[in-house]
């Protein structure tokens, strides 16, 4: 017998289904017309799109697609951040996967790169992280990793979505099997050992005072332990897992708290992670923000000087500061830009053979050590650079480059259709062209839709701060007038 979901994607099964199938495939919530998978998996508000029934069926259909790609199915790793909804979604995903006949290894609270690493270095056929990264507590997300630890391809994501929307057929026999769930939180120790092994054997943080903003999130157990093991004096902020407060006025997108703590404790440096610890932002002893552009420059320069950076190539995004790009070119390096999103950086790194890439927002990928952005690893290696240089992080940054004034503004769009087709707004396209002509080669304009939130992001960069302010205000006004109403 064959069963199928109804053509309208409601999730209701046809009348030929058995009691077994109905117990496994319950009614889906409303699915938006727009694609479910964004630049970083599926994101949304918990309790709206991201419900237990949705995660159950997502797990089931993901399991079916994953099983179809291998003759010897292994387990699926599931990790999660500290959000209140993460337990629910992780358990529902596990139920769906096991109802598809797969074994699930539950890792519990851990950073996203931990899931990627353990998936790559085990018999797992996939990894799943329950997290909405830097988003507020009421949001959540589900991101998938291939068996090699890289982000799930768009084609596989589409196959899974086709199942959810009723475009795949299954026999009853295919849904009559079930797997088991194993709880494996101690595997996180294997990831910590990998972090340790990636560092120079001679590295010591003795004498360093380091502040860590853990954002009430996934790094609370890993980051402090790693820095303390290296001998650093560690001051922790937001240091427990707290699902009500994750990312709230803290972490990598709210650096004022870290800056104040560094001044208060007269620390050498500090690091702020986001909720799932796949990104990091640093702050030096003077309170200056050391973002992904600075980290790429400093780490890239170190690799270049050692002959470990093929073609002197770095991969950045369209957000990378012009000051960074021109300083890097001054060292004989080249910078290739991609769209915003670490999956695009990763793809370009594979295509070009680049060993280091990342985003201004703090997603840094180094292929010498792994295949995913890793906030804790990046922080450890930046501390290693400081140790090896014999000078402070503040001194390294001071001698690197001066940034061009860059202003980023966000405009929220609740209308999904307007957000999806924003590029068809002719007044906005005309305004962008006007700004580009107005600044010429002295600046840049970037308007884009966020891949993770219902936002239009407007960025203007210019040698002249007044010009940057003028054009960003002008463009935001156009977006608010023609799209946000």
From Swiss-Prot:
The lineage of its organism: Bacteria, Bacillati, Cyanobacteriota, Cyanophyceae, Oscillatoriophycideae. Binds 1 Mg(2+) ion per subunit. It catalyses: alpha-D-glucosamine 1-phosphate = D-glucosamine 6-phosphate. Its cofactor is Mg(2+). It comes from Crocosphaera subtropica (strain ATCC 51142 / BH68). The modification Phosphoserine is found at residue 133. SUPFAM superfamilies: Phosphoglucomutase, C-terminal domain (SSF55957), Phosphoglucomutase, first 3 domains (SSF53738). Mg(2+) binds at residues 133, 274, 276, 278. Keywords: Isomerase, Magnesium, Metal-binding, Phosphoprotein. This is Phosphoglucosamine mutase. One of its GO terms (molecular function) is phosphomannomutase activity. It is an enzyme of class 5 (isomerase). The keyword Metal-binding applies. NCBIfam families: glmM. Catalyzes the conversion of glucosamine-6-phosphate to glucosamine-1-phosphate.
